[in-house]
Amino acid sequence: MKRQILLKAGLPVLAAALLIAVFAMAAQNEPAVTQALGQAGATGPWWMWPLVLLFFCFILGIIAVLAGVGGGVLYVPLVSGFFPFHLDFVRGAGLMVALAGALAAGPGLLKRNLASLRLALPVALIASSCAIIGALIGLALPTNVVQIALGATILFIAILILKSKNVAVPEVKNPDALGIALGMNGVYHDASSGKDYAWKTHRTLPGLLMFIVIGVMAGMFGLGAGWANVPVLNLMMGVPLKVAVGTSKFLLSITDTSAAWIYLNKGCVIPLMAIPSIVGLMFGSFVGVRLLAKAKPKFIRYMVIGVLLFAGAKALLKGLGIG
């Protein structure tokens, strides 16, 4: 209890200290900061965009929790579509946003046995390697090509969310040899029903091959990959929904780290973009959790689908030089 109180009190203080430190450093090096933001594509006073991003990401954090989607999948298309930043910098910040959420959630999920380390490690090895390749491809391609591909991907994600029907505890009658050899099985306790569920996987090889594509897309677009991890783990491989969600969140802390290093190494992560975005999403998530009990998930879900369709279409048109 004391630990939870300390965490709740300490996180806002730490976030405020980070923001103050970033703004103080920026004020001392104003010409360099203005030049850096200019390279990112921003115009106007240097302090305006971090404040706008902070407020925007606060709203985004609330919506992400209520809709049950990762912040990264909303952050990249919306910020690239409605802010004057270059896409490379948006993708770098998007990976940092997804990574921050995953690192915060990972230890708790492992402790509650909602994330399976045996399931995550083989998947993470494939996805993180491919995320590095995806990041290198994304930075090498012309911006308009990446915008077109991003728009098409966001439209696909919106359709996937609309059509997907996850199964709480899929029935796996015949686990395959690869899943058994890799130890992809376990037991988790469902607190809501008070029952223990034993689970195992099937169609393991096709599932692992899917993570090659997921890893490349995560690195190329800076989206994180929770939107794709859960359907593959749950619907294709037969992992219970709660374990799939928990393992997916833990996976992001490994997959996004490898891709984020590429963007950091190329100078595509600007603290004045990344830190306000992370802090805004963090505070928004706290508010979203409190509103979750009162919200109507169906309405929020359709609202997010609508936002993604609009953002995907805007990115597609921007890449084609129309919007």
Regions found by a protein language model. Name each.
Residues 100-106, 279-284:
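Central cavity-lining transmembrane alpha-helices of secondary-active solute carriers
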Residues 1-60, 81, 87, 111-215, ...:
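Juxtamembrane transmembrane-helix boundary motif
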Residues 91, 245-249:
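Small-residue hotspots at the loop-to-helix junctions and early N-terminal turns
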Residues 63-73, 218-226:
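Short helix-coil transition sites and intra-membrane helix breaks within transmembrane domains
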Residues 60-64, 214-219, 255, 259, ...:
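Hydrophobic transmembrane alpha-helices of secondary-active solute transporters
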Residues 68, 105, 131, 259, ...:
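Conserved kink/hinge residues within transmembrane alpha-helices of Major Facilitator Superfamily
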